[in-house]
Amino acid sequence: VRDRLDGARQDAGLRVMKEEEFYKNKPKNVVKIEQDRVWRYTGTDHASGTIAVQYYFGGETSANLCDFFIYMMQAKADTLKDPFRGVPRMVMLDPGSANTSAAFKNLCKSLDVHVQINKPGNPRAKGQVEKANDIVETAFESGLRFTEIHDIDQLNRLAEHWMRYYNGTQKHSRHGMTRYQAWNKIK
């Protein structure tokens, strides 16, 4: 938040939390900004390795999870540049409260999607998503420090632009194709 010339205060946009201000020994500082924190949702397709990412306010909620799941399934504005869409047969998640919520389970049931909740302490079960998070952090978010982000919509537009670039140009080591090339081979 910064002061304007007329004395009013306005938000200065999204920014990284300072580690010395927000850490485990200062929980009240974290609680104050809880609803303003930006949460990243990352999903992948197992066969192609395609990565999807979106950002949300409000934490890990069933509403945010359902919105992200629908975002992953729906056709994007330009399906030639971003062909990733469709209803999966199965979704694999960790046992978080949003992931096991009635809202998400009902959405999946209505779409005939099997929900596989991984057992706690089995990190290999979600290794692909962990690697996708690493890729998002190093290949996309690391460059955000050079960009002034004004709102979450701008952040999501940048994320979509990056996803089209990354999924469309970077070859996956497992199958030797770009993620979108592999996606387009799925029948």
Stretches found by the model and what they are:
Residues 72-80, 95, 111, 115, ...:
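A generic secondary-structure signal for well-formed alpha-helical elements
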Residues 47-50:
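Short, glycine-anchored, charge-dense loop/turn motifs used at functional sites
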Residues 93-94, 101-111, 115-141, 153-156, ...:
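RNase H-like two-metal-ion nuclease catalytic core shared by retroviral integrases
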